[in-house]
From Swiss-Prot:
GO terms for biological process: 'de novo' cotranslational protein folding; cell division; chaperone-mediated protein folding; protein transport; protein unfolding. InterPro entries: PPIase_dom_sf, PPIase_FKBP_dom, Trig_fac, Trigger_fac_C, Trigger_fac_C_sf, Trigger_fac_ribosome-bd_bac, Trigger_fac_ribosome-bd_sf, Trigger_fact/SurA_dom_sf. The keyword Transferase does not apply. Consists of 3 domains; the N-terminus binds the ribosome, the middle domain has PPIase activity, while the C-terminus has intrinsic chaperone activity on its own. It comes from Oenococcus oeni (Leuconostoc oenos). This is Trigger factor. Its EC number is 5.2.1.8. One of its GO terms (molecular function) is ribosome binding. GO terms for cellular component: cytoplasm. It comes from the Bacteria.
């Protein structure tokens, strides 16, 4: 039978959503903590005349005093006792507490004060059967034709232009160019037989535009001004002239939409109508998946928007916790690819593990989590040990790591929380009513 720890917890409200949680650590737990702390340190203890790891606790205490073990003892026993104190005080906290121990006393209970931040309260609106607009999954002729056109462009080939044809955006020109500023050439301003797709934005603004409307064999003086923030400081903001010779003009030639094209695109079909049918089927599947995701997101957002959260300004601790969860997910994804965090940070020019998002998106994500947690509480959603074990197996398989590694990197409490939120989402989505989008 598990002993129930009584902490005599009390909570005193402070300014805003801050406050002080005061509680006691019973003597029995202090004694247990000191034992754990000694066992942790004993292999490192070095006393003349004794081998490492063979010093008794009594000798250690006589030599160094209990105080030498207090920090490790507190670290060992505090998490569970703090959680019990929070439950006794009937409060919901966010972030990490700032612990202020009075002092540890082996023979009696020790008083602890913790500066804590209270979680905002949530007043739910409707969350079952909410009506949400949903796009039709039907594929229109316009959408099908656009996809067929995209497939045609994918099979297009560059062919030499006819003599009377002029260059347009999307065409490719093969050019020589020689640039100068104030009549003087500059490094990197000259090339021969350079292949340039007009409209690609490879060159500074204005350069490609001035090559539109010309034929192969034309000589063109292109006049441009380098941007003020141009990487070469000696050219930034300066006017330049490029002497350009167009050697070749090539245009994209798209194949005809016929049976031969259909067989080139998909060797499992024989005629164009088969390709159209398969393409339409794929578009419908993709559209249905996209609409499903949008419908679910809209249903959840409607529930979040219908809830009242007090205070409206979320504690910074909640934002920080959210960022930590994102980082955990990010590094779990890396682990699934065989990349350790230290390996990632050694790669040059890598972005941060969690890209910065604007305050509104961050706040909405935390609000969503609060609302889902409240729904889970009201609906008494409590994942079973079997469900948690199943999730551990699923994560191990997804990230290609051992189950023991999942258990090390993600606590059972975090897994339980994620499953609660997931089941709250399912409750909202499964009961939501789809209405035709106007």
């Amino acid at each position: 039978m598990v002993d129930i720890i009584k902490t005599n917890a009390t909570f005193k409200a402070g300014k805003g959503n801050k406050g002080t949680l005061s509680f006691e650590i019973p003597a029995k737990q202090i004694s247990s903590g000191i034992d754990q702390a000694f066992n942790k340190q004993k292999d490192k203890i070095n006393i003349p005349g004794f081998r490492k790891g063979h010093v008794s606790k009594e000798l250690f205490l006589a030599r160094f005093g209990e105080e030498a073990l207090y920090e490790d003892a507190l670290n060992a026993i505090l998490p569970d006792i703090y959680d019990q104190a929070v439950n006794e005080a009937d409060i919901t906290v966010v972030g990490q507490p700032q612990i202020i121990p009075d002092d540890l006393k082996h023979g009696g209970p020790s008083k602890i004060h913790a500066e804590v931040t209270l979680a905002p309260t949530v007043e739910l609106g409707d969350y079952k059967g909410v009506e949400v607009e949903k796009e039709s999954d039907e594929v229109s002729d316009k959408e099908l034709n656009a996809e067929l056109e995209r497939l045609q462009k994918g099979e297009a080939e560059l062919v030499p232009a006819k003599e009377d044809q002029v260059s347009e955006k999307g065409d490719t020109v093969v050019i020589d160019f020689d640039g100068s500023v104030d009549g003087k050439q500059f490094d990197g301003g000259k090339a021969q037989n350079f292949s340039l797709s007009l409209g690609s934005g490879q060159f500074i603004p204005g350069f490609e535009d001035q090559l539109v409307g010309h034929k192969a064999g034309d000589d063109v003086d292109v006049k441009v001004t380098f941007p003020k923030d141009y990487q070469a400081k000696n050219l930034a903001g300066k006017e330049a002239v490029f002497a350009v010779t167009i050697h070749e003009l090539k245009k994209l030639e798209t194949p005809a939409l016929d049976n031969e094209f259909a067989k080139d695109v998909d060797d499992s079909v024989l005629v164009l109508e088969e390709l159209k049918a398969k393409t339409k089927e794929k578009l419908a599947k993709d559209k249905a998946e996209k609409n499903k995701d949008a419908f679910e997101d809209a249903a959840i957002q409607k529930v979040v928007d219908g809830a009242k959260i007090n205070p409206e300004k979320l504690p910074e601790e909640m934002i920080n916790d959210d960022v930590s969860r994102q980082m955990q997910t990010f590094f779990n994804n890396l682990a699934g690819q065989g990349v350790k965090p230290e390996m990632y940070f050694q790669i040059p020019n890598q972005p941060g593990a969690v890209k910065a998002t604007n305050d509104r998106r961050r706040t909405n994500r935390v609000k969503t989590n609060l609302v889902l947690e409240e729904i889970a509480r009201v609906e008494k959603i409590n994942p079973s040990n079997e469900e948690i074990d199943k999730e551990i197996k699923s994560l191990a398989s997804e990230y290609n790591i051992k189950e023991s590694e999942v258990e090390k990197s993600v606590s059972a409490g975090m897994l339980s929380h994620d499953l609660k939120v997931q089941q709250a989402v399912e409750l909202i989505v499964n009961s939501a009513q789809a209405v035709e989008k106007k």
